[in-house]
Amino acid sequence: PLYEYLWAYNGDQMASELNMESKHSIEKQTAHHVDCFTTVSDITARECKELLDKPVDMVLPNGFENDFVPKDGTFTKKRKAARRHLLDVANALTGDDIQEDALIVSTSGRYEFRNKGIDVFIEAMNRLRFDESLQKQVVAFIEVPGWTAGPRQELAERLDSGRQFDTPLDMPVLTHWLHNMDDDNVLNRLRTLGMNNAKDDRVKLVFVPCYLTGDDGILNMSYYDLVLGNDLCVYPSYYE
């Protein structure tokens, strides 16, 4: 509905109604005074024209450099290591026997619950949980930085042991404790849907609420190394 009637919205008025005047003002003034104003998609170019009153000078390609993906044997080695670690984390959290051929799915980005489609991702995994035609296990990861209080010590100890586990931890959906456990959008949605990684759930969901810089205390791999372990990455952002 927003984009169908985008032409009818006034950016200044909407910012006032949504109590976002400061943020909107900085963005608008920047757009009007920079030497070159760009964006990375036609739809965000429309937003700029209608909401910031400033057409972009150029729409740039949105992608990665060619060397983003490791080549040949390096790719295979890194992918295998990432998959093994992701499956180990899932087992250590849930106590379930995660098969080697499990489908690993993830979404990531800024913690904008609706704007980045995190709500859609969770709902999709929940529907898949009840799909009787599902032939293999699915392990889904939400990798968005939240208000992290620190890595879960009991999870780190399980991972350090190198063992496989058949009993779950408390809160078997979360890798790092949060300061706002009762107010976190992802955790609240999982509670509402009853997604708690039960033993008989064919779809397991793991929330990783930290920056993946290689030293988070649980995954300890950079995002660009870890993402190689996925079979599918999903980015259902509202604005795209």
Q: Which residues fall in each region the model found?
A:
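Catalytic cores of nucleotide-sugar-dependent glycosyltransferases that transfer UDP/GDP/TDP-activated
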Residues: 1-240
